[in-house]
């Protein structure tokens, strides 16, 4: 119930067209959800990711919402590259103050969910 309520306040779903696009992707990638709350909203985390050697960043979904006198941004990113480059990007995100969750795709139901 709480997840459904939060989902109505914060649109963290990927667009339907994304599933067809991602199926055709033949490069190694991971999906990540990044949440920026409060002061972390002002940090150039995604811009810095885009500058990393050997890493492509695709913004799949995004939402920015006021939340109790502050701001919250939620991005769903596709990080594309070799395993080492993606691992380094994840480490950078983790130390940046953003909240990161790795996501997986349930192809049968065409939904994105948090990885186990």
Give the location of each predicted region.
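Non-catalytic connector elements of ABC transporters
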Residues: 22-116
């Amino acid at each position: 119930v709480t997840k459904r309520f939060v989902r109505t306040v914060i649109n963290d779903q990927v667009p339907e067209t994304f599933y067809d696009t991602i199926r055709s992707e033949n490069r190694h990638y991971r999906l990540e959800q990044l949440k920026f709350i409060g002061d972390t909203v002002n940090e150039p985390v995604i811009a810095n990711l885009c500058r990393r050697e050997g890493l492509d960043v695709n913004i799949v979904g995004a939402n920015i919402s006021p939340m109790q006198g502050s701001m919250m941004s939620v991005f769903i990113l596709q990080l594309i590259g070799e395993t080492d480059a993606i691992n380094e990007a994840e480490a950078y995100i983790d130390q940046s103050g953003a909240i990161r969750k790795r996501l997986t795709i349930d192809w049968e139901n065409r939904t994105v969910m948090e990885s186990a």
